[in-house]
Amino acid sequence: MSVKIRLKRMGAKKKPFYRIVVADSRCPRDGKFIEEIGYYNPLVEEKTVKVDSEKVQQWIKNGAKPTDTVDRLFKNNGVYEAK
C-alpha cells in the first residue's frame, strides 16, 4: 500500500477549500482517507494553511510521500525544510 499526503477538495462549485489528508494512493481524490492532518484555504486574501506538523513528520517517517502541491505548501509554510 502506497500512502500519499494530498489535498481533498471540499466546498461549493467555484469556491474550493482543501483538507490535507493521508490516503492510499489508489483511492479517489475525494474518497476514503486514513487521517486528516490539516486544511488549506486558497480563497481568502491571505491564503490559510493549518497543519499538524507533528503528524506530518510522523507520516513522512513512516513512508508517506507528499504530492508536489502539498510538498510546496509545506515548504512555503515552514512545516519542514527544503532539501
Swiss-Prot record:
Domain of life where this protein originates: Bacteria
Classification lineage: Bacteria, Bacillati, Bacillota, Tissierellia, Tissierellales
Keyword check for Cytoplasm: no
InterPro entries membership: Ribosomal_bS16, Ribosomal_bS16_CS, Ribosomal_bS16_dom_sf
Entries under Gene3D superfamilies matching the protein: 3.30.1320.10
Annotated PANTHER family: 30S RIBOSOMAL PROTEIN S16, SMALL RIBOSOMAL SUBUNIT PROTEIN BS16M
GO BP terms, alphabetized: translation
Family from the record: Belongs to the bacterial ribosomal protein bS16 family.
GO cellular component: cytoplasm; small ribosomal subunit
A Pfam family it matches: Ribosomal_S16
GO molecular function: structural constituent of ribosome
Gene this chain is encoded by: rpsP
Organism per entry: Finegoldia magna (strain ATCC 29328 / DSM 20472 / WAL 2508) (Peptostreptococcus magnus)
Protein name: Small ribosomal subunit protein bS16
Keywords: Ribonucleoprotein, Ribosomal protein
